[in-house]
């Protein structure tokens, strides 16, 4: 059980590596440029969803990117307090940047 935070572009090596290590017991929070990994129809959003991990996207970053209506199904928007609450549940975290 691991929290992955992804704030790099979906085209980055870090984003691909993150997807290869995910399990169904993990959680992913997309923020910064990482929110683009949640775009409906993208290969990486499919990899994320296929992993079985819980996937969240930081709402202020989604809104700033202008992709609020384009997130893939199964990716939940969260605010900053929810980001902190989720982070507090995980003793181990892997930051992908």
Describe each model-derived feature in a short phrase.
Residues 13, 39-46, 79-82:
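A short, acidic, amphipathic alpha-helical segment used as a generic capping/interface helix at domain edges
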Residues 65-97:
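C-terminal structural segments of small proteins and small subunits
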Residues 20-24, 46-52:
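Short, conserved loop/helix-junction motifs that constitute active-site signature segments
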Residues 35-50, 68:
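N-terminal beta-loop-helix "entrance" segment that forms/cooperates
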Residues 2-14, 32-38:
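Short, glycine-rich nucleotide/cofactor-binding loops
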Residues 1-4, 27-33, 67-70:
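Short, basic, glycine/proline-bearing loop/turn elements
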Residues 1, 25, 52, 90-91:
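A general structural motif
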């Amino acid at each position: 059980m691991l929290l992955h935070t992804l704030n790099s572009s979906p085209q980055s090596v870090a984003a691909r590596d993150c997807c290869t290590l995910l399990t169904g017991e993990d959680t992913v929070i997309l923020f910064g440029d990482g929110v683009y990994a949640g775009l409906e129809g993208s290969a990486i959003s499919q990899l994320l969803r296929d992993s079985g991990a819980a996937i969240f996207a930081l709402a202020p970053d989604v809104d700033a990117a202008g992709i609020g209506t384009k997130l893939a199904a199964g990716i939940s928007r969260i605010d900053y307090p929810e980001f902190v609450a989720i982070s507090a549940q995980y003793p181990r975290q892997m930051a992908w940047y």
